[in-house]
C-alpha cells in the first residue's frame, strides 16, 4: 500500500471527485493538501465546501493558512511538505489536483511491487485540452512515487519542485506504465474560458506567455486541433476514460 498526496486548490474542483474515486482503488491513506489562498493572494473560498462535503475516513485534509511560503516554488513545495507528515506508508504518490490515475491500472502496477526497488518512479500520462475527449497524441509525464525516508525538508524544497525527486538519485524509473497501458491522465487545460483565466492568474507560469490573449483567441472559435500551450496534435475520444 502507498500513501497519496494531492496538491489541491478549488480551481481543480471539477476533477476532485474523480481523483478521489480513482485513488481510493489503491490507497487508504489519501491526503489532500491546500493553501488557504491562491498564488495571487486571493482567499480560496471554495475549500470549505470541498472539505465539509468530501472528508471521509480515507481522505484527510491539510490546509495551510499561515502564508509562510512566499515564492511560487515554495508554495508548491510547501503544500507537499505539509502533507508528508500525515502519510503512514513508506512510499508516497504525489499528484496535482488535475492528474487523475486509472485506479484499476495503478492497483495492478503497484501489486507487482517493482516500485519498491527504486527511490522514485514517475509515470507516462495522456494530456488533454479544453474537453476530456480531446487527447494529445504526444505523451507527457506526471505523478511521482517517492520513498518517504528521502523526503527531508531540504530535499522537498528544491528549485525543481517534485521533479527533484527523480533528479537527485540514479535509482529511479521514469515514464512507467502497466503492460504498455498509460496509467495517468493529465487534465491541466480541460477548462472553460473562465476557468482557464482563473488558472493563469494564479499559477507559477503566469509570466511565460500572454495567456489572456491566447485564451481569448482560443474561445473565439471551435477547437482547431492544436493547443496553444505545446502545439500538440489531437485525437477525439468516443468516451471519457476517467
Language model: regions and residue ranges:
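Cell-envelope/extracellular polymer assembly enzymes that use nucleotide-activated donors
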Residues: 1-5, 29
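Short, conserved active-site loop motifs that form the nucleotide-linked donor/cofactor pocket
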Residues: 2, 57-60, 118
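Short, well-formed alpha-helical segments that are part of the catalytic scaffolds
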Residues: 11-26, 30-34, 39-45
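Residue-level detector of structured alpha->beta connecting loops
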Residues: 27-28, 88, 117
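Active-site acidic Asp-centered loop
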Residues: 35, 95-96, 122
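Active-site-proximal specificity loops/subdomain of glycosyltransferases
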Residues: 35-91
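Catalytic-site signature of metal-activated, phosphate-bearing donor transferases
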Residues: 69-84, 99-242
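Short beta-strand-to-loop acidic/aromatic patch adjacent to the donor-nucleotide binding site
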Residues: 89-102
Amino acid at each position: 500500500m502507498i500513501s497519496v498526496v494531492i496538491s489541491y486548490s478549488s480551481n481543480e474542483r471539477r476533477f476532485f471527485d474523480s481523483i478521489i474515486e480513482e485513488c481510493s482503488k489503491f490507497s487508504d491513506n489519501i491526503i489532500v493538501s491546500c493553501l488557504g489562498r491562491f498564488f495571487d493572494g486571493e482567499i480560496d473560498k471554495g475549500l470549505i465546501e470541498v472539505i465539509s462535503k468530501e472528508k471521509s475516513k480515507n481522505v484527510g485534509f491539510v490546509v495551510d493558512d499561515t502564508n509562510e511560503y512566499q515564492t511560487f516554488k515554495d508554495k508548491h513545495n510547501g503544500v507537499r511538505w505539509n502533507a508528508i507528515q500525515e502519510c503512514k506508508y513508506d512510499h508516497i504518490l504525489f499528484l496535482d489536483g488535475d492528474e487523475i490515475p486509472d485506479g484499476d491500472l495503478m492497483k495492478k502496477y503497484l501489486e507487482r511491487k517493482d516500485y519498491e526497488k527504486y527511490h522514485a518512479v514517475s509515470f507516462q500520462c495522456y494530456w488533454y485540452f479544453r474537453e476530456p475527449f480531446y487527447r494529445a497524441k504526444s505523451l507527457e509525464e506526471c505523478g511521482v512515487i517517492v520513498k518517504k525516508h528521502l523526503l527531508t525538508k531540504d530535499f522537498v524544497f528544491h528549485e525543481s519542485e517534485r521533479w527533484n525527486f527523480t533528479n537527485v538519485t540514479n535509482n529511479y524509473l521514469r515514464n512507467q506504465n502497466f503492460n504498455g497501458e498509460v496509467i495517468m491522465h493529465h487534465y491541466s487545460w480541460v477548462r472553460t474560458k473562465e476557468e482557464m483565466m482563473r488558472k493563469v492568474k494564479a499559477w507559477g507560469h503566469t509570466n511565460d506567455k500572454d495567456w489572456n490573449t491566447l485564451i481569448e483567441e482560443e474561445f473565439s472559435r471551435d477547437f482547431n486541433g492544436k493547443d496553444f500551450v505545446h502545439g500538440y496534435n489531437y485525437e477525439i475520444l468516443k468516451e471519457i476514460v476517467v
